[in-house]
């Protein structure tokens, strides 16, 4: 009788264990029965990329060139951030279509081409000059847009007087001048006798320009400590419009336009 009871107990226990195991298997959802959705991986948007990469700028700001007779000729000269230097040249016949006369004080009265700037640069220059007056600083515009032919005449005369190598240290070859873009303006002051000279950088007006130009989208294109990068002697009077965003980035990181585009990425 005892053996029968033990046998019955063992059988009952086994059935209980099997029943428990069966319930455990059913409680575990199979992959096919799972209703959980897998989150899709989203591609980063241009806005998100710009937030994570501080050097991101619109692709349209990069200079596009094509090799013509061994010279890199710019194909998008209307780009306000266009890089013009000894390596990258503007098309010979290029003339901006939006040239206007900025409403600022000039050092001369004649209505000649150097009075003009491209419209975005002209508006920014007006803002710059107005801010200067508010700080009791009085600037004078001296030389803006310059055609290819005019630059050719200026360089040829300087080369004849001083030699081509010496002339090229301060005067760009025709096609390689930022003045042809309509985005550059040379400025001076009465305290500097309206001259375009290094001494302007030591005047109150020149120091104000160095500290504030970028707030209005302008940079001092040829800095004294960057001659080895630009290949151009120090020109505290030469202001180049590139837009507030790029100008601020350049000043904050002490970069020339050449150095900036080595770091910048397109979005």
Region locations from a protein language model:
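Extracytoplasmic cell-surface/polysaccharide-interacting catalytic and binding patches
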Residues: 21-143, 148-267
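Sec-dependent N-terminal signal peptides of Gram-positive bacterial secreted proteins and lipoproteins
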Residues: 1-26
């Amino acid at each position: 009788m005892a053996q029968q009871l033990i046998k019955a107990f063992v059988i009952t226990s086994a059935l209980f264990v099997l029943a428990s195991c069966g319930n455990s298997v059913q409680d575990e959802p199979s992959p096919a029965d799972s209703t959980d959705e897998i989150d899709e991986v989203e591609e980063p948007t241009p806005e998100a990329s710009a937030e994570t990469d501080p050097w991101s700028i619109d692709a349209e700001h990069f200079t596009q060139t094509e090799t013509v007779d061994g010279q890199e000729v710019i194909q998008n000269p209307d780009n306000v951030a266009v890089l013009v230097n000894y390596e990258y040249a503007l098309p010979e016949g290029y003339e901006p279509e939006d040239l206007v006369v900025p409403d600022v004080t000039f050092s001369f009265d004649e209505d000649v081409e150097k009075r003009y700037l491209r419209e975005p640069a002209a508006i920014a220059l007006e803002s710059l000059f107005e801010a200067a007056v508010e700080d009791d600083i009085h600037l004078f515009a001296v030389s803006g847009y310059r055609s290819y032919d005019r630059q050719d005449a200026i360089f040829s005369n300087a080369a004849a007087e001083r030699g081509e190598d010496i002339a090229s240290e301060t005067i760009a070859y025709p096609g390689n001048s930022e003045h042809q873009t309509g985005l550059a303006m040379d400025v001076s002051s009465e305290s500097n006798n309206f001259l375009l000279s290094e001494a302007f950088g030591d005047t109150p007006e020149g120091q104000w320009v160095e500290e504030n130009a970028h707030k209005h989208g302008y940079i001092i294109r040829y800095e004294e400590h960057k001659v080895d990068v630009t290949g151009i002697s120090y020109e505290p009077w030469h202001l180049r419009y590139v837009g507030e965003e790029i100008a601020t980035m350049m000043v904050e990181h002490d970069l020339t336009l050449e150095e900036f585009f080595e770091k910048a990425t397109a979005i």
